[in-house]
């Protein structure tokens, strides 16, 4: 994929990232080889300062594994995760620890991500106390209250416990914890999927406001295209561990190229009843194949209406530029 010039600083450059897991064989034979699950299989992606990269795809497509490999929660099998010119996959010890201040994460289940035995104040303060032990208690408490105010939490709840809060409030606590170290980038792993629709909008708008105020860059993972469209500057569409389409959000949503992206877009409801009735639904046949035994050639060919014999023989590569790129033998960006 060709890189186009931009005035913004390139923070994250993911190159041919692969995350494979060895799965024990269910065979009764003791000498059976373990299976190889390809959770992420050669992803390229870029994120510029102040932008949001939206990652979308069906459940099981590798979105969360991709995000966790960036931050180092799962080990990359191959490829590079270049952060400000340095490959995170090769960092260890003190050097890797220092980068953790710049890259934080918000998790999918807001309540499960919070320690039930710790107060809200202690949860938010924990990263600060870990990386800046020289701060006294009053300084820590002051910063915690300041961050609570930024995310819309009242200071008088600082001594309460997670179970006393709603899902949306718990996610605000998680956001405050991620922001307390003043990171450059936050990875949001489906942060609104466990919340009610009305609360989803509040959390997404809060993230957009904080991004504008603090100059944050976001990697935002979701399966809801309407959320991705609302928050993203760039979009990466994943299918079975592979990137099938990527580019600027306006290009992806105004003219989706890949058959999989088109099918996802056609499933999004349109508020206007006349347009909703008139639109063409592009159906996908069959289920998502197993990542342990993916189809040969193009991984999407078993569900693709455009598939031909060559699709079973040749695996397409992503072609295009930073504005719009697609991975299909029958479509060009």
Role assignments for model-derived ranges:
Residues 87, 138-156, 265-266:
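Conserved ABC ATPase "signature" region
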Residues 191-195, 199-276:
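P-loop NTP-binding/switch modules centered on Walker-like glycine-rich loops
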Residues 161-165, 169:
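Conserved ABC ATPase signature
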Residues 180-184:
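A short, proline-enriched helix->beta-strand linker immediately N-terminal to the Walker B motif
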Residues 30-33, 88-104, 130-133, 137, ...:
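ABC ATPase NBD coupling module
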Residues 5-7, 24-31, 248-333:
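Charged, flexible cofactor/metal-binding loops and thiol motifs
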Residues 79-87:
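Conserved ABC transporter NBD signature motif
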